[in-house]
């Protein structure tokens, strides 16, 4: 089944899970699409089975809190950042609920975490105005970059380069093998005083970069030239909430939730609005991602919703 405008418009909430007492701050699908794992401000980690459509287990990180949860390539392991006490990144085995390793270094809250798509490398960005490069096999930071402001960062789909959005006004591209030489490209965007950048993602085909903000606009950039191809607005975000925006796996569409529980979908190439879906969420849709392998997506406020198409194209 191929994603088309009409298939996207047909999506409806198939299941709602009420496992959390506070907002879900992040979730991540496994690369095979079979599970999704969430982190929440209630200090819990919930693992869901996407095929059976049910929660499998819940773990807790009471002392440090849990945010920015990401699967690693090893089965049943995740990395996540803390949202209280310290700013150490933790590497957890879900299998026995034990920490494998800690990654100390940041001295302010970690606001970005991206796992390499190809190996054990990951990068983190923090309010301490640094980006750090790590390897899961070592607690020591493998590289450090000092920046002029708050960073958001992400690997490209090949894992060869990473992009850093700095101070909500420029995107810098770094070669992973020689990042200490500085960026090989810098794209300066018009500075918007009304909002901050909160996320940065590449499309799976590597051609586009999506910049999300805590305001009412999203931007799509050409990943090679840095030109702004589209600015998307028209969704509600009056309170400056961090709303996750995502590409569909085929790189053709861009989705974002809103503070009123609705999901907005645009065509990434034409910039036309394709769908407006009502998730009936009780709060802002803080997290939204399409499953990498199956025709389903998930959205979350303090509840988690699984969506399915209602037509067979």
UniProtKB/Swiss-Prot annotation:
WD repeats lie at residues 19-58, 105-144, 146-184, 192-231, 237-276, 280-313. GO terms for cellular component: chromosome; PTW/PP1 phosphatase complex; Set1C/COMPASS complex. Keywords: Chromosome, Cytoplasm, Nucleus, Repeat, Transcription, Transcription regulation, Transcription termination, WD repeat. It comes from the Eukaryota. It is found in: Nucleus; Chromosome; Cytoplasm. SUPFAM superfamilies: WD40 repeat-like. Coiled coil: none annotated. Its main location: nucleus. Pfam families: WD40 (PF00400). The keyword Kinase does not apply. One of its GO terms (molecular function) is chromatin binding. The keyword Transcription applies. Belongs to the WD repeat SWD2 family. Component of the SET1/COMPASS complex. Component of the PNUTS-PP1 phosphatase complex. This is WD repeat-containing protein 82.
């Amino acid at each position: 089944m191929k994603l088309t405008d009409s298939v996207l418009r047909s999506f409806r909430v198939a299941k709602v899970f009420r496992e959390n007492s506070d907002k879900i701050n992040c979730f991540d699908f496994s690369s095979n699409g079979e599970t999704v794992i969430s982190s929440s401000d209630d200090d819990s980690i919930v693992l869901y089975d996407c095929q059976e459509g049910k929660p499998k287990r819940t773990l807790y990180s009471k002392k440090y809190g849990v945010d920015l949860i990401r699967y690693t390539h090893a089965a049943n392991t995740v990395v996540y950042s803390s949202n209280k006490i310290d700013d150490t990144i933790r590497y957890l085995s879900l299998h026995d609920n034990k920490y494998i390793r800690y990654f100390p270094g940041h001295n302010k809250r970690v606001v970005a975490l991206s796992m390499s798509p190809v190996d054990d490398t990951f990068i983190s960005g923090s309010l301490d105005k640094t980006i750090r490069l790590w390897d899961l096999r070592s607690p020591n930071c493998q590289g450090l970059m000092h920046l002029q402001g708050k960073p958001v960062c992400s690997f490209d789909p090949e894992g060869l380069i990473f992009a850093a959005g700095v101070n909500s006004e420029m995107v810098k591209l770094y070669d992973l093998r020689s990042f200490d030489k500085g960026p090989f490209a810098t794209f300066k965007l018009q500075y918007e005083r009304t909002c901050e950048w909160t996320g940065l993602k590449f499309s799976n085909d590597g051609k586009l970069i999506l910049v999300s903000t805590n305001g009412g606009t999203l931007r799509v950039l050409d990943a090679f030239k840095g030109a702004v191809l589209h600015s998307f607005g028209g969704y509600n975000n009056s309170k400056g909430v961090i709303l996750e925006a995502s590409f569909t796996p085929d790189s053709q569409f861009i989705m974002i939730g809103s503070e009123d529980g609705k999901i907005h979908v645009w065509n990434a190439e034409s910039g036309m609005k394709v769908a407006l879906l009502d998730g009936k969420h009780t709060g802002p849709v803080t997290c939204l991602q399409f499953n990498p392998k199956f025709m389903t997506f998930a959205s979350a406020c303090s509840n988690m919703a699984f969506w399915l198409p209602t037509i067979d194209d």
